[in-house]
């Protein structure tokens, strides 16, 4: 073994006592190279193999075991990725339950604790590219589960409810308080007074096309609509606003004649059915025509403007029709109530 002054000792690797040693600028002898580079720089999740450097990476890629694992991955990559994703999610949530069950903590803190495990599933092996995407996925999943629970509670209240009584359920957005909610859940009694006489309930009325009408009697507080119903209703209103126009002429519809051509949206060239004469008429002078039940009609105004549909039924009292869309994005959708003025017979 030899000794040099600290001022003259360079930074490098020397053979000391027959072993490869690293000498830093301060003159301290550190452990050998293999110990200094023990931290893996490359990890194969499928092979559960860690490589320290580029040479080890190349050697492993050429090995037979790696080729077999790549063949397994190529046969069904979706199943493999989903498997790692489920394992990552389960382990991440288990760590949260154990370490941060009753506290609010940042996702990065939990993730840093998670990756301390040398055998953890790496994020690159899952279907989430970043931790942010994974957290958004957890939030979305929790929201869907909450909606399902809300819908199930509404069904139970509708089945078990009776006139004059209501089941009051307090919803809490915090999943950590599930046990507390279950303990505090109680059925509250609602006081009510009857008048001198009670009107007997008649037979339930029918809807336009033979469907039984649901009981619409108010029982105190109005029931909350599910988020899905609200979204669907808003989407219908948006489409109605966008497609509701003050003109409705389309080529190929029958209006006591056949519209051969539409001019400036409001004027059409009409071919008379009997005389075959062609006239130019403003839409104010025209009226829509309805075929027999089962005939084809075009929706000329409203949310589904331009769609070809089949006439299923008519309600002469409310001047509405029931149609089913054929072809297109909304193929098969049934519109239970649409006004006569919004549909017209196809030629």
Swiss-Prot record:
Subcellular location(s) of the protein: Cytoplasm; Nucleus
Record key words, sorted: Cytoplasm, Nucleus
Sequence motif: Nuclear localization signal (NLS), positions: 222-225
Main location: cytoplasm
Protein name: KIN17-like protein KLP
InterPro entries: C2H2-Znf_KIN17 (IPR056767), DNA/RNA-bd_Kin17_WH-like_dom (IPR019447), KIN17-like (IPR037321), KIN17_WH-like_sf (IPR038254), KN17_SH3 (IPR041330), KOW_KIN17 (IPR041995), Rib_uL2_dom2 (IPR014722)
Top-rank lineage group of the source organism: Eukaryota
PANTHER family per UniProt: DNA_RNA-BINDING PROTEIN KIN17, KIN17 KIN, ANTIGENIC DETERMINANT OF RECA PROTEIN HOMOLOG
Lineage, opening ranks: Eukaryota, Viridiplantae, Streptophyta, Embryophyta, Tracheophyta
Organism of this sequence: Arabidopsis thaliana (Mouse-ear cress)
Gene expressing this chain: KLP
Signal peptide as annotated in the record: none
Record GO cellular component, one term: cytoplasm
Role description: May act as repressor of root growth during copper excess and of hypocotyl growth in the dark.
Chain ranges passing through the membrane: none
Family designation: Belongs to the KIN17 family.
A Pfam family matched in the record: KN17_SH3
